[in-house]
Amino acid sequence: MNLIPTVIEQTNRGERAYDIYSRLLKDRIIMLGSAIDDNVANSIVSQLLFLAAEDPEKEISLYINSPGGSITAGMAIYDTMQFIKPKVSTICIGMAASMGAFLLAAGEKGKRYALPNSEVMIHQPLGGAQGQATEIEIAAKRILLLRDKLNKVLAERTGQPLEVIERDTDRDNFKSAEEALEYGLIDKILTHTEDKK
């Protein structure tokens, strides 16, 4: 069972209780703190769209601590980040792996961050298939197309040549915050909240 903390806010109109995620959303902070599936993606996309409608000029911060997950769900978040007008900064806390790393790199260039002890892991898509030979062939072709699409976006987002991305994503490739910075997955390592400004 997941308990969600409640925070009490005092205003001149009295007290108001929020669940922590609603309170963070009020400050334009979205938390991706789980594996990425369709439900998580729908929640993140809804929050992005809400904040974009509320103020199309004000930056949104997406904090990521995720082992990755579904490619199609992750691409829904990615496409929405590119689609909306507000700039989306990304901050890795803990681990951004697989699709989590992809979304970290997808933040506004110059506004992609990691905390000092966080880790980033990139790799090629994982998948499986069963059934008749033709169905397996169709699934294999699809996963290869997805791999090529993800690699092209990562090359564009990091500034690395496509061949380097293809080589480096062949297996699980873990990077410290410093290595992620050198690689171009992030733009800065944050040690204090003021560093983000």
From Swiss-Prot:
Record's catalysed reaction(s): Hydrolysis of proteins to small peptides in the presence of ATP and magnesium. alpha-casein is the usual test substrate. In the absence of ATP, only oligopeptides shorter than five residues are hydrolyzed (such as succinyl-Leu-Tyr-|-NHMec, and Leu-Tyr-Leu-|-Tyr-Trp, in which cleavage of the -Tyr-|-Leu- and -Tyr-|-Trp bonds also occurs)
Protein's GO biological process: protein quality control for misfolded or incompletely synthesized proteins
EC number in record: 3.4.21.92
Keywords recorded for this protein, A-Z: Cytoplasm, Hydrolase, Protease, Serine protease, Stress response
Disulfide bonds: none
CDD domains xrefs: S14_ClpP_2
Location relative to the cell: Cytoplasm
Protein's job: Cleaves peptides in various proteins in a process that requires ATP hydrolysis. Has a limited peptidase activity in the absence of ATP-binding subunits ClpC, ClpE or ClpX. Has a chymotrypsin-like activity. Plays a major role in the degradation of misfolded proteins. ClpXP is involved in the complete degradation of the site-2 clipped anti-sigma-W factor RsiW. This results in the release of SigW and the transcriptional activation of genes under the control of the sigma-W factor. Probably the major protease that degrades proteins tagged by trans-translation.
Domain comment in the entry: Peptide exit pores open in the compressed state; in this conformation the active site residues move apart and the protease cannot be active.
Name recorded for this polypeptide: ATP-dependent Clp protease proteolytic subunit
Lineage: Bacteria, Bacillati, Bacillota, Bacilli, Bacillales
